[in-house]
Amino acid sequence: MSFLRCVVLLLVLMSNLHAADSRLPVTGGERQWPQASGPQGTWAVGADSVPLKWSVARGEGVLWRTTLPETGQGGIAVWGNRVFLTTLKPEAGQLPLGKDVIGHCLDAKTGKILWTVTLPGRETSVPAYFFSDATSPSPVADGQHVWFFNACGSVGCYDFAGKQIWMREWQPTGGRPFNKQFEPILFNDTLLNMEPRDADDPKREGKDPWNYLRALDKRTGRTLWVADDAMTHYNTPVFGRLPDGTPAVLQGRGAYHGVPELPIGLSLTSLAAGKEGKTIWRYETNRSKACYTMHWNAKYAAWFDIDASEHQVLDVATGKLLRTQSLVKQVDWRRFNPAKGKHELLTGVDLTKQTPPLKVFPAQFCNILLGDWHYFLCYTEASKHLGPPYCVGRVHLETGQVEYLEVPVSIVREAGQPDQFIWNRPQTSSTVNSRGIEVATDKRSRGDGWWWGYLGSPTAIGGKVFFTTMLGITYVIDGRAAVLDERALLAVNDLGHPGRTWSLNSLSFAEGRVYHRSMKEAVCLGPK
């Protein structure tokens, strides 16, 4: 091969690499975790090697642990040698007020807290509320700056030394339980937040204003545009691209407590230059709630109908409903038989004909698309006949095949003792913070997370799906398994001893390490 041809080939390869990188929502973020949804903005990332097993209770696979001064339930941003997360502002000798948020910058190698900043709030959230609180939105980073959020009404931009660049405050919608599940999205120089229209905006609704995607200039905090269609504050929108490369965000409407935004359903909102905030398509329905992470891929978007225990698949190009799939009929259910100490298969069963009849209510915000499968946890509540109990579920987007695998609720790990799995029994978690103060005022926050709470969104790394419950238990599922059986359960990990741990967090992954957190501490996990 001639020298000239070598040069041409190298230029082509570099051009292709640049084109691939330019498709990332955050430039240069392919090896980082710049936002809650990861470098692709989809909560999924490829990886050749990922830590699968750890135990904070035993100190196994733990590179560092850092005590946090107060509770928090947002995700973790990682860029280079910096880790960013938030907690509520601690109050001396008492539980936090749930209004102000502290942004923390940690050293990624040691876990040392390097600096902190305070973000003020205009509303008040319930501390350690098992739906959400002021810390629910995760930080965002781009290698030069980090943006911390307070769901009670502020966002601040800082450089990596902690110097404030700008601060924006706004008035969140109120009058209902807090339940704000929005996760910020960074796309190029545009930072997406969820806010109502400004008070002087002629399009703003009256006494009960709607929420919208609001685009901010990441450099100044100035509003660039507000999306055409509204969204509920319960919803977690997701970034993606259409087959032609058009960048867009899938957002939803419809939730509890009479949220006003209409119509119930989905909107795909464009981020393309010159069409920012415009609606590509809208799917309207009078059923169910948009209380999920709104995953979609190059072919399909998905919607759970919790009233009918059904899964709906939409054409991502048009928003047209393609098919409705039952989550209760002709399903394969692998449940654990404690007498035999192993799983048993019930194949092709109708859950509505069990004793008692079962309904399937996919756990809200605990869902993720991986390939052609939509994975989720199943809410479990005997009095409401919800199940299958303590199961990971998945439904195939094309065939409608549905599988359920029961997993242990918890695990007891003591030094020198074998692991003890706890099956099919409700458990309790602890909402005592690192300073020994009980911070939860709602007793429901002390459950196991398998019923009526908003767990952290699952993350897929290298084809493995990581689910974390309120107990701090993290299940690792082989997302490429041909069959969802006990072999697909790769690990049951912990963030601390059972009954003494609490987490509503998603994990992050960068440079071969997993970053996670509980109420009491942040941890870095991986091989030493």
Where are these regions (language model features)?
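N-terminal secretory signal peptides that target proteins for export/translocation
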Residues: M1-F3
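Bacterial N-terminal signal peptides
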Residues: R5-N16
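Noncatalytic, solvent-exposed loop/strand surfaces
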Residues: A20-K528
